[in-house]
Amino acid sequence: MIEHDHVKDDHIKDDYAVAVPFYDLWHEDGHVPLVRELLPPLLKGVERSVIEIGAGTGLITRVIAQETPARIYAVEPSLGMRSVLVNRLAEDPRLLGRVTVLPCGALDVEVDEPVEAIVMISVLQSFPAEQRAELWRVLARQLQPGGRLVFNWRERALPVPGDLEVMGSYAVGRHAYEVAGQVLEAAGESVTSRFVYRIRQRGVAISEDEVVVTNHWPAGERLAAELRAAGFDRDAAPEGMEMWRLP
């Protein structure tokens, strides 16, 4: 059975546009409600500035904005996702003045001054082992001393390849927006999955697109060792979340 998570890669831009119409529907049915509950206490005391890695369409951006008065740097490489995010900001003049949208990936982010916090929700799996060391270096360079790195994470058993299964179906007017997925290959910490996005009318598919993506799920011990090697210290966080600080 395929895991239900945000699957996005910093190197996939317009190819991921096929998922944009399904994005909020699927993620509101997935990890986003839990993150809304778990993230706010981890941002307590943050007042000046936050980087959000992989802002997507802005679902978590709004959570950050509600819980802190800080300026937000929303990093999003996908043009399709970024377009929805900017349109969402345009609906609220207060957010439009606080959120700077950066059209780049996590490895290329640079902001004007060190920030108090970096938030990264369902993005870490996009980075293979050979890129994560650079990721930690880049993020550490953006944080002020004592700054916090917050992300969601949990241990996972290696999935078994299988058949395509419907993971969610959502009514939009008289249409059903359907997301299906299957694991194609799993080895070590890498899992290659296929996702199919269909729009159905009276049960008949009138639109169908697919994306194949490889995600990377290191063991918790390895992840902790990488972060410590990059100079981070672990801080307390609820189950399902991680918080690490620079000394």
Where are these regions (language model features)?
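A short acidic, Gly/Pro-enriched loop at the edge of an enzyme's catalytic core
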Residues: 110-118
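Class I SAM-dependent methyltransferase SAM/SAH-binding core
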Residues: 59, 64-108
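Conserved class I S-adenosyl-L-methionine
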Residues: 1-56
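C-terminal lobe and adjacent flexible extensions of AdoMet/dcAdoMet transferase-like proteins
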Residues: 216-247
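Conserved beta-strand signature within the Rossmann-like core of class I S-adenosyl-L-methionine
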Residues: 146-153
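SAM-dependent methyltransferase
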Residues: 153-218
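A short glycine-rich, Lys/Arg-flanked "PGG" loop and its adjoining helix->strand segment in the class I
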Residues: 133-145
